[in-house]
Amino acid sequence: MQFERRFTTPGTDIFAQLSYRKASSEIRNPDGTIVFSAQDIEVPEQFSQVATDILAQKYFRKAGVPAALKKVEENDVPSWLWRSVPDEKALAKLEEEARYSGETSARQVFNRLVGTWTYWAWKGGYFTTEEDAKTYYDEMVFMLSMQMAAPNSPQWFNTGLHWAYGIDGPSQGHFYVDYQTGKMVRSKSSYEHPQPHACFIQSVDDDLVNEGGIMDLWVREARLFKYGSGTGSNFSRLRGSGESLSGGGKSSGLMSFLKIGDRAAGAIKSGGTTRRAAKMVTVDIDHPDIEEYIDWKVVEEQKVAALVAGSKLAQKHMSEVMRACVEASDLDDVARYNPKENKELKKAILAARKAMIPENYVQRVIQFAQQGFTEISFKTYDTDWDSEAYLTVAGQNSNNSVRVTNDFLNAVLENGDWELIRRTDGKVAEKVNAGELWQKIAHAAWACADPGLQYDTTINEWHTCPIGGRINASNPCSEYMFLDDTACNLASLNLMQFRHADGRFDIEAFEHAVRLWTVTLETSVLMAQFPSREIAQGSYDYRTLGLGFANIGGLLMAAGYSYDSDEARALCGAISAVMTGRSYATSAELAGEVGAFPRLSLIHI
């Protein structure tokens, strides 16, 4: 493919064409103590403090960056694209603590990302000439620096650590399909093939310990969370509570396993220290355990309310019981602990009982006072989303959705019965009133914002690849609706950066950017590794790309259009059409150069 320059000048170092400045970034506790500090870092001149903080706190590699590097020669790759490894001889001359550090400049990050994309695109045969590769590199660095576009977070976390710095580690159980042979390969390292995809949909079978089953899913999810990705699954294959097991006995049901997955996700921060796990749980509306699932977070939220209110009441009344014992100085050491003799103690005990403080706790405080203690310590909780109260209850580490069909919605309209189906034999487990089930969903969404709804019939009517299988689930944010065991790589174009001062939208520059980023996302599929064989194969076969735009609200506001207006919808539709058309045209270009993706015959648009 050939590439033209629109933003940059040939023959000049791209970083010399851009302005950078020194900045700092900090995170402080409410008491002023410093949690994170990055001083004297380098960012593009126009970066806001928010952009600086995100780059420094989330996307800079924090460790393992060598102070000295050397290139690894590859005969079929231009020398400026050779990957780097630590220069051990040069490092040996430095003090041990100076040999490795973290990234401190946006230049390092942009080179790490774009250099890796260019390297793999070159190896994949995407460039007609070396000059095309240089043009692609410069234009992409420019767009990142000017905040014209950005890839999804796993790219910032993982892409280029091996290419730019020689950072690596043992295989984590990932797989990829070799782009040259089409054969499945088990990854031999952590970062040579990075995990750049943000959005995954994974299948799960009604099997406890075998590959593809319940416990295997938690392992696959852990691989994704570790490198900063998110995942969604439809758990409707799992049998309901009380259904028969093959070895005799009854199943503990769907909810028992969802709670295990919830705890596992909560224990792993996506990207190590970067963010929390992103997880979507979906269950079909005809599952036998659907009612308990709908109410799951409602009940857990009520537990938090009970913890908060109960802990504060207990602390208040137990302290009053203690104070009544301690301050009864006019009574002897026997009478002061006897409510028949100590009127203040009697009053405090009655108030505690009225507040439903457990009797054994009241007596424990009195016994504590008898041992000479003068105050009681009882932990209280609050409703902060990151508090210990929320860490204590279940259901806090996923978005929950219910998959509803048109048949169910019609049953709601007719106030008819709805059948819940056993997973083991397909027979009816129970009949419930569809309207009441709908009201239960509405109440739960009002009470705790979950579950959301996924309209199964409509989603599959819009399916672009129905021959490949049905759509059962989505990623956590739900912008990716596709087949089980596939992944999608996202990037967003910042629309405000394509708006001129006079209000004109630069369509030509926008199309230019769409073409470059379509190639980037396609390259990311080529270079990626995946958490299972099935996802590696599915992503290779379909090569789904997630190109979109951001800041439509800002563009509409700058144009003077209200968000929900005919003008706004027309503008949004036009931009979407241009983006989609140019991306499709670029995909056709790529197919002409390197061949179409394997499952093209199953696609209809």
Per-segment meaning from a language model:
Residues M1-I603:
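Extended catalytic cores of very large enzyme megasubunits
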